[in-house]
Amino acid sequence: MDTENRSRADLALPNPQESSSAPDIELLEASPAKAAPPKQTWRTFLKKELEFLGATQILVGLICLCFGTIVCSVLYVSDFDEEVLLLYKLGYPFWGAVLFVLSGFLSIISERKNTLYLVRGSLGANIVSSIAAGTGIAMLILNLTNNFAYMNNCKNVTEDDGCFVASFTTELVLMMLFLTILAFCSAVLFTIYRIGQELESKKVPDDRLYEELNVYSPIYSELEDKGETSSPVDS
């Protein structure tokens, strides 16, 4: 019994008024979790390539303008068959080049300054440029079919200026077709990106409104609970 009482006496309960000799435990603030890396989507990929798309359109426009200038300065368009030089008589290498250069220039400027009027202007210019490029592709394909049909008739002809012009312009038309397809893809991709950006900017205020409602809803519920608990006491 004595040993049991001694063992109980040795067990001293801690006094809350006495300062504990044990070292204070430092409370470490939980470091905030690292933000997850942004999800890679087609829009993030296009955002990195916007200036490249604009530069592509400018380059395509300048090359088409050079081709049109060379043909119109070397050849008299009115002296040859209309089917062979249909593209140049309609002036596509000139007005198409102007639209490509303009849309490419606005694309680069709007990406660097990112103001509202430049963004809207670049969007409209690229829509017009994509329509012009689609029209140009149809015209180029039609011109190629006319050239191939004309060159088939040149097999039995030894010397003919029209056949030489047809073979020369066919090579230029093929290169312009490739460049126009490239400009069309650039304009369409830029247009899709800008339209997606416009739609996302319209959704942001609604999302913020829902976030504010979610933040304030616990406060409102707490006030309602306090009002319900205080009403029986008042009665």
Swiss-Prot record:
Residue ranges that the UniProt entry lists as topological domain Cytoplasmic: 1-51, 110-122, 192-235
Sites of Phosphoserine modification: 217
PANTHER family per the UniProt record, alphabetical: HIGH AFFINITY IMMUNOGLOBULIN EPSILON RECEPTOR SUBUNIT BETA, MEMBRANE-SPANNING 4-DOMAINS SUBFAMILY A MS4A -RELATED
Region (Disordered), start-end ranges: 1-23
Presence of the UniProt keyword Mitochondrion in the record: no
Organism: Mus musculus (Mouse)
Pfam families assigned: CD20 (PF04103)
Protein name in the entry: High affinity immunoglobulin epsilon receptor subunit beta
Family designation: Belongs to the MS4A family.
Post-translational modification: Phosphorylated on tyrosine residues by LYN.
